């Protein structure tokens, strides 16, 4: 995406009236994984709906282009993340979750713009690092994260289902440019 096109994307805090559009964009963005992880998809879809419907302590951001929401992300503070009724994972840094770009807006820098805003906000709060989780199915996202300077953080990995590894990544903000 050229600088001119990137500047046409406006990142802002989500509003209550954005909720339906956020859910539509998020589900559309993640729908491609339904066929690739059928045994896991139903639970993951429920998690997406619950997270978007009640972001809790997370900052919910949206990317707008031409007056339409074309991307969204959740930015959580450090916390203890519940993985199941018995398991949890300490997240020592702020965490990006559910980065989603409408399929029609992909390749235009929307995801990168949302990520840069998350980095900016964590830096403003004097955070030392930013974390996220992803899977090997999300190769495009993984390449973007690595270009931005994220590195593997295996201590944040977890296994929500047999054969499914959710990989942790971290961006050290003291080293990142």
Residue ranges and their predicted role:
Residues 98-116, 125, 136-143, 147-148:
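Conserved glycine-rich acetyl-CoA-binding loop
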Residues 1-4:
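Short acidic N-proximal helix/loop "leader" segments that mark the beginning
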Residues 28, 92-93, 128-131, 135-177:
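C-terminal "cap" of GNAT-fold acetyltransferases
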């Amino acid at each position: 995406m050229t600088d001119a096109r990137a500047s046409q994307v406006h990142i802002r805090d989500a509003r209550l009236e954005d909720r339906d559009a956020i859910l539509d964009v998020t589900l559309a963005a993640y729908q491609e994984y339904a066929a690739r992880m059928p045994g896991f998809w139903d639970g993951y879809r429920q998690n997406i709906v619950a997270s978007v419907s009640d972001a809790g302590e997370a900052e919910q951001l949206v990317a707008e282009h031409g007056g339409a929401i074309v991307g969204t992300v959740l930015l959580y503070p450090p916390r203890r993340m519940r993985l199941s009724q018995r398991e949890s994972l300490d997240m020592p840094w702020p965490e990006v979750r559910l980065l989603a770009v409408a399929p029609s807006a992909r390749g235009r820098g929307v995801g990168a713009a949302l990520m840069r805003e998350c980095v900016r906000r964590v830096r403003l709060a004097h955070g030392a690092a930013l974390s996220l989780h992803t899977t090997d199915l999300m190769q495009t996202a993984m390449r973007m994260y690595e270009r931005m300077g994220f590195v593997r953080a295996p201590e944040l990995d977890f296994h929500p289902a047999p054969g499914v590894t959710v990989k942790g990544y971290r961006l050290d903000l003291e080293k990142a440019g």
